[in-house]
């Protein structure tokens, strides 16, 4: 093999290994940031025949059980139960809860599984209807906006 071919082969191999290393690092990073979504029933009973491992990062969504919210008087630590149609899962959270958080409300918590039915959350998101409007905004709109009056032609549209 002449020197020119050796140089080309070296360049091609360097490019190949560089691309392979880049793809490998990307897959590793995506794996580390991937949080699987579970409901409380799926967490306890398993999802597709597989239960998450203790220490695994995950997201869980469900309804906050009425009467289960417990706040620590000394800190921002809160614990509450989350349920869907089956078993309950306890969520432990240290931080300020969203304004829309309340008992009976849907939430999504992101955290780490501590044991089979307990999650140490580092983020809690309150779910709400897409038509949600803060009461202050609704009152202001009632005062300044009159409801639109449609004619029968406008209500029927372009139906021909």
UniProtKB/Swiss-Prot annotation:
It holds the Pfam family CcmE. Residues 1-8 are cytoplasmic. Keywords: Cell inner membrane, Cell membrane, Cytochrome c-type biogenesis, Heme, Iron, Membrane, Metal-binding, Signal-anchor, Transmembrane, Transmembrane helix. The chain crosses the membrane at residues 9-29. One of its GO terms (molecular function) is heme binding. The keyword Ligase does not apply. It is a single-pass type II membrane protein. Its main location: membrane. It is found in: Cell inner membrane. It comes from the Bacteria. GO terms for cellular component: plasma membrane. Heme binds at residues 128, 132. Residues 30-160 are periplasmic. The keyword Metal-binding applies. One of its GO terms (biological process) is cytochrome complex assembly. Belongs to the CcmE/CycJ family. Heme chaperone required for the biogenesis of c-type cytochromes. Transiently binds heme delivered by CcmC and transfers the heme to apo-cytochromes in a process facilitated by CcmF and CcmH. This is Cytochrome c-type biogenesis protein CcmE. It comes from Vibrio atlanticus (strain LGP32) (Vibrio splendidus (strain Mel32)). The gene is ccmE.
């Amino acid at each position: 093999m002449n020197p020119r071919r050796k140089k080309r082969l070296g360049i091609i191999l360097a490019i190949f290994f560089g691309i392979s290393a880049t793809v490998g690092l990307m897959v590793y990073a995506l794996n580390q940031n991937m949080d699987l979504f579970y409901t409380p029933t799926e967490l306890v009973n398993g999802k597709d025949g597989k239960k998450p491992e203790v220490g695994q990062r995950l997201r869980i969504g469900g309804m906050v059980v009425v009467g289960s919210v417990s706040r620590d008087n000394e800190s921002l630590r809160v614990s509450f139960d989350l349920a869907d149609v089956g078993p309950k899962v306890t969520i432990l959270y240290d931080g300020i809860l969203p304004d829309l958080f309340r008992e009976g409300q849907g939430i999504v918590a992101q955290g780490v599984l501590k044991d089979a039915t307990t999650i140490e959350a580092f983020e809690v998101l309150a779910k709400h209807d897409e038509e949600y409007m803060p009461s202050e905004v609704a009152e202001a709109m009632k005062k300044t906006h009159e409801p639109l009056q449609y004619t029968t032609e406008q209500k029927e549209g372009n139906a021909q």
